């Protein structure tokens, strides 16, 4: 479910040594499965553990996860990185915004999951997003861009060299291409 690097484990042990005995960490997701999902880590005193919580045992502490957050923390990674700017904990949870779908789920569900978990987080860097409006009978994903992507002069590159390339690779043999249904209007909202 959650991978915690050795560096992060050592950091948690150091932090927890200054807390009440029996205190562990809690890893959670606020607003799981939505575009506003946020992950967090907090102290978890012994009396804050619920019967339905999952305990993951690490070196010197447990990570406690509530029942609602658990599926959204699948494949989550916590690391403690040090660079010239200092040290910090990083938490990557690729399934926080959308629950992972099974490999045999309908194609439309797998495309929507890919959009929410991989594509939209990248587009969000430019204030944009994309939604799947249709999956045609002849195997084309019809997308609509919004936010900073609407009217952006780089949208064709994003569509063909980015999104379509990723989707055709991931859904080889199932998807024939990607089309843009957006009526692009350049304006101050456009990224480029």
Swiss-Prot record:
Q: Which residues take part in binding [4Fe-4S] cluster?
A: 149, 152
Physiological role: Involved in iron-sulfur cluster biogenesis. Binds a 4Fe-4S cluster, can transfer this cluster to apoproteins, and thereby intervenes in the maturation of Fe/S proteins. Could also act as a scaffold/chaperone for damaged Fe/S proteins.
Q: Encoded by which gene?
A: nfuA
Cystines in this chain: none
Q: How is the cofactor bound?
A: Binds 1 [4Fe-4S] cluster per subunit. The cluster is presumably bound at the interface of two monomers.
NCBIfam families in alphabetical order: PRK11190.1, YhgI_GntY
Please report which protein family the annotation says this sequence is part of.
Answer: Belongs to the NfuA family.
Q: Which GO terms describe its molecular function?
A: 4 iron, 4 sulfur cluster binding; iron ion binding
Q: What is this protein called?
A: Fe/S biogenesis protein NfuA
Give the species this sequence originates from: Alteromonas mediterranea (strain DSM 17117 / CIP 110805 / LMG 28347 / Deep ecotype)
GO terms (BP aspect)? iron-sulfur cluster assembly; protein maturation
Q: Which SUPFAM superfamilies match?
A: Fe-S cluster assembly (FSCA) domain-like, HesB-like domain
Matching entries from PANTHER family are given as:
FE_S BIOGENESIS PROTEIN NFUA, IRON-SULFUR CLUSTER SCAFFOLD PROTEIN NFU-RELATED
